[in-house]
Curated annotation (Swiss-Prot):
One of its GO terms (biological process) is cell migration. It is found in: Cytoplasm; Cell membrane. InterPro entries: Serendipity_A. Pfam families: Serendipity_A (PF05482). This is Serendipity locus protein alpha. Required for the cellularization of the syncytial blastoderm embryo. Involved in the localization of the actin filaments just prior to and during plasma membrane invagination. Sry-alpha together with nullo and bnk may provide auxiliary functions, by acting both to stabilize a large and dynamic microfilament structure and regulate its functions. One of its GO terms (cellular component) is cleavage furrow. Keywords: Cell membrane, Cytoplasm, Developmental protein, Membrane. It is a peripheral membrane protein. GO terms for molecular function: actin filament binding; beta-catenin binding. Transient expression in blastoderm from nuclear cycle 11 to the onset of gastrulation. It comes from Drosophila melanogaster (Fruit fly).
Length: 530
């Protein structure tokens, strides 16, 4: 460990040198070489100092490794194009932060200081797991208790470390944080579902001590249904917001923001406000994508994108507002390119983890509601959102999953969507029946594609599916290691069986080397830079 800490110290000294160096890239080459040694040694040492993957410090290490690689890439370009000091400082500050966080995390791992994971540190999905497992425990014990021993059960239940009321409160906090950026109709529905959940939780706890086990079982089931209802709707609201945000990224892009600021700085405030709102939405989508995702590499990439976008969000608009000069143009250009690259990575990784059938279903719901709408602006918007589905299948991993019939229908989708875009964007008046006809064809083609994908997904696992039927009342979610696994099916993410997030009993050596593979990925990136 002393060698790792010494390498980090050397890296920090080189970053300090970078603040004062102008045009000299020698210190950056030395930094890359030293950091490569550090990452290689860390890969060999990590199974020893972090035997379990379920660790906040390990997550921080992976995030920092990814951020260092990202910053080095853009810092190299910044130096080569002789961008101004403020551009260089932006990336140096982020590198410095990463090195300091790496130092803290490694020190805690070396000292066997396991960070206490409070409820505040749990994701929405982890909190749902805790709450549902909590209720499962209670229901199992309730079934074994006679009425005369029910009071003993109630006393032991309330003494649990993670009291259910506290867990539910944190679930509601996550849901309301998302509701703050959700579309208006979903915000109202999420708020109502949160109120219902809190009411059911209050009833469950207020009735503690009720001598009738039948009543207690009904109250527990009502609370469980309220939890499922909230999780299920949040999945759908997340998909709604994804459609809205990805389109808003086009309508309020950095390029359009830059043009608006150059033409009319005062009049660009509305676009700046829309840009800020969309960044808040992207952050919430990312947070929930991390919570729902099963793969540690995917989680790390999303975390890194969010970290980059958050740091850029604070400085990209001011960069575009700087007085026009060569240095300010270079500064804005570097930040703009970095921003667009991070958005592209974010968009691709979200499309990679999202469930294709659920995405199409969500769009079909929106399309079905608006087919007969006469307002042309609304029709343009809904057709534009269809491009999100097309983009989803531009990703090789999603397109390759289509059968031959699916690929044929996908071609039909592209053709009919182009027709819809053409007809709603015509400047001359168009017979509404022509628009409705094309939208109905679009709906039919999408429904056919959805049915083909769902059929293909079910056929390989039909034997498994027959053994573990999903109840009709279940939400469209599932969990990593929760006992409620069989009851839940997440609509946001693909339903994959190979989960690479470790339970507390798993070790790095026994986990398929996912953590080591992730470090190998980072090392490869660093080598590519050299």
């Amino acid at each position: 460990m002393e060698q790792l800490l010494a390498q980090l110290h050397t890296c920090s000294e080189l970053i300090a040198e970078g603040y004062s160096s102008t045009g000299n890239i020698g210190w950056l080459n030395e930094f890359c070489a030293t950091f490569l040694d550090f990452a290689s040694d860390l890969k060999a040492r990590l199974p020893e100092v972090a035997p379990s993957g379920a660790n906040l410090d390990v997550e921080t290490i992976f995030l920092c490794l990814t951020q260092v690689v990202t910053c080095i890439t853009h810092l190299e370009r910044t130096i080569s194009m002789e961008a101004p000091h403020m551009t260089r400082q932006h990336f140096l500050d982020r590198l410095d932060w990463c090195l300091r966080r790496l130092l803290v995390s490694l020190t805690q791992l070396e000292g066997n200081v396991t960070p206490v994971k409070n409820l505040e540190d749990h994701s929405f999905v982890e909190l749902m797991d805790l709450a549902l497992d909590h209720l499962d425990d209670y229901m199992e014990k309730l079934a074994q208790q006679r009425n005369n021993s029910l009071h003993i059960l109630e006393e032991s239940f309330t003494e649990d470390t993670y009291q259910l009321a506290s867990i539910v409160n944190h679930i509601v906090r996550h849901a309301l944080a998302f509701a703050n950026v959700a579309i208006h109709s979903d915000k109202k529905a999420l708020t109502a579902l949160c109120e219902t959940l809190l009411a059911e939780c209050a009833t469950f706890h207020e009735e503690a001590g009720e001598p009738n086990s039948g009543h207690r079982k009904l109250e527990a089931l009502s609370l469980e249904r309220a939890l499922y209802a909230l999780e299920s709707f949040l999945n759908e609201a997340l998909l709604h917001l994804l459609f809205v945000s990805l389109i808003d990224l086009e309508n309020a892009s950095v390029e359009k923001l830059k043009d608006a600021l150059q033409r009319d700085p005062a009049g660009a405030q509305e676009l700046i406000s829309a840009f800020d709102t969309n960044m808040d939405r992207i952050q919430q989508i990312g947070v929930l994508a991390i919570a729902f995702s099963q793969d540690i590499k995917t989680k790390t990439i999303v975390r890194s994108c969010l970290a980059s976008l958050e740091s850029l969000d604070a400085c990209i608009v001011p960069a575009l507002q700087l007085p026009e000069s060569t240095s300010s143009a270079h500064h804005a250009e570097v930040l703009q390119e970095h921003f667009n690259q991070e958005l592209l990575i974010f968009r691709n990784v979200i499309h990679e983890i999202i469930d294709s059938c659920s995405l199409i279903n969500n769009y079909l719901d929106m399309l079905g509601e608006r087919i007969h709408v006469q307002d042309k602006s609304h029709l343009k918007l809904i057709v534009q959102r269809g491009g999100v589905v097309v983009d989803h299948f531009r990703l090789p991993v999603n397109y390759s999953g289509l059968s031959e019939d699916g690929k044929r229908v996908h071609k039909d989708l592209i053709l009919i969507l182009r027709e819809c875009q053409a007809v709603v964007n015509l400047d001359v008046p168009v017979d509404p029946k022509r628009i409705v006809k094309r939208l109905k064809i679009l709906y039919s083609v999408l429904a056919k594609l959805r049915d083909l994908i769902c059929r293909d997904n079910l056929e390989p696992d039909s034997s498994v599916a027959s053994e573990a039927q999903v109840p009709s009342s279940a939400t469209r979610t599932f969990v990593r290691s929760s006992r409620s696994f069989g009851k839940r099916h997440r609509s946001f993410v693909k339903q994959t069986g190979n989960c690479s997030v470790f339970g507390p009993q798993d070790s790095l050596a026994e986990s398929g080397h996912s953590e080591s593979d992730l470090i190998s990925f980072q090392i490869t990136e660093i080598l590519r830079l050299d």
